[in-house]
């Protein structure tokens, strides 16, 4: 968790916005995961969200669903995901890594076992898209004791009372979903999202980042104005999806992310 906090402190001191790319572990190939993570850091990533493949990713659109399916067909599970982070940490002890996925794989793996191994691998936070509120406190306590941040989601349909609760318990950063729907959709409402983001930032002690629908430098800049950072997922996953080899995947990661980094650095 400390890596997330330190990263946002540094960015705030520099008046810079966080750039948070999402990739699916094991896609476009098992061999490409760690090299692509390093390529993203070189291109300007501040935090990496690493997707844990799941057979029923209900919050994800077709792009990430298919990416998850491809990874599952390659045999990717939590053990591979944690090993990927462990290998990444051998040459990058600074960049925060947040695992993003669903509760079921963790329950099957065992929450306590997962927590212990995630900490040992160098994971900094976990975002569980479908975590029921009634289970969140117990898992948050387990994660917190190990130094893992439980990243929470808020959306346009989240009630005011629920937002107040989330703002009080958020760790690492709060992830605001820019619209109600699935990942990869293209219907940003910058004004509405901006109003909500300003309100969230005023009532929570952690940074607020925004995702869903961000696909290029222009959309990243529009959404970053009222946020502490932006998450880009489906568009990046698409760019990587058919990379024939590791080198191509790394070049595509750099070519996709570098323009977003340059554009965000102009936003104050």
UniProtKB/Swiss-Prot annotation:
Gene3D superfamilies associated with the record: Aldolase class I (3.20.20.70)
Species name: Xylella fastidiosa (strain Temecula1 / ATCC 700964)
Lineage, highest ranks first: Bacteria, Pseudomonadati, Pseudomonadota, Gammaproteobacteria, Lysobacterales
Origin: domain of life: Bacteria
Molecular function (Gene Ontology), one example: tryptophan synthase activity
Reactions performed catalytically: (1S,2R)-1-C-(indol-3-yl)glycerol 3-phosphate + L-serine = D-glyceraldehyde 3-phosphate + L-tryptophan + H2O
InterPro entries noted in UniProt: Aldolase_TIM, RibuloseP-bd_barrel, Trp_synthase_alpha_AS, Trp_synthase_suA
Active site: 49, 60
Pfam families attached to this UniProt entry: Trp_syntA (PF00290)
Name assigned to this protein: Tryptophan synthase alpha chain
Keyword annotations from UniProtKB, A to Z: Amino-acid biosynthesis, Aromatic amino acid biosynthesis, Lyase, Tryptophan biosynthesis
Gene Ontology cellular component list: cytosol
PROSITE patterns named in the record: TRP_SYNTHASE_ALPHA
Family: Belongs to the TrpA family.
